[in-house]
Amino acid sequence: YTSEDVWNAMSSLAEKDLTDQLGIAPGPANGFTLDMIECFEKFGDVMDWAMIILNPFEPWPGQHVLPAAQKNGVKILTRVVDYGGVLHDDVKPGHHFRDGDHRTYRPEGWVDHACEKIEKIRPIADKHGLSMIQLACQWNLAHGPVESVVPTLIQEAGPDAKPIEDKLDDLAALPGENLLSAEEVETIRKIGDNTGCMALKG
């Protein structure tokens, strides 16, 4: 997606009304920050959207593409705002993941560490009357070019798991205005800071 030939071809699709939106969604892994910044700088004038991984517990490295997106007029759609389901608040320490669940390949103890962080940011959610997933969505949307969030919806195993319908209702009740102060956004970022957790790609 940093190839001029690719973007010339993509632009021709838009010119022929075969699409009304152009964008990129690198992945499924994280860390394509350098390539994305280069792409925004070279082709931002023909790009509408880009999808990145961003959430309160994974601010890095996605946060570094945001200034380039803002500068070049690229709208950002953020996925995995729920941090592997933990921010839906029904994945707790000792949680049993179903066989084949991709989250079982994460480092041991990731749920425990995430739940510790949840308790540190819960007072901010409580102050504003937000659930944890609503707080995560508001945090993402507080960043300039972010215009949409895409949580993952998984029916978790176990008797205490929230039904997917309840998770959808929770998301539908997200306030239209952002309730977080700049100080609260930064406090959450510091609590969730994951700087250097992977090698950057590109």
Regions found by a protein language model. Name each.
Residues 4-8, 60-63, 119, 134:
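Residue-level marker for well-ordered alpha-helical positions
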Residues 67-202:
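Structured C-terminal cap/extension of enzyme domains
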Residues 32, 60, 159:
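Glycine/Thr-rich phosphate-binding loops of Rossmann-like dinucleotide-binding domains
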Residues 11, 61-72:
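Histidine/acidic residue-rich metal-binding segments in metalloenzymes
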Residues 6-10, 35-39, 65, 117, ...:
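A general structural detector for well-ordered alpha-helical segments in enzyme core domains, enriched
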Residues 54-63, 125-131:
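Active-site glycine- and acidic-residue-rich loops that bind
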Residues 1-56:
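Glycine/proline-rich, positively charged
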Residues 1, 34-36, 61-63, 87-91:
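Short, well-ordered secondary-structure micro-motifs
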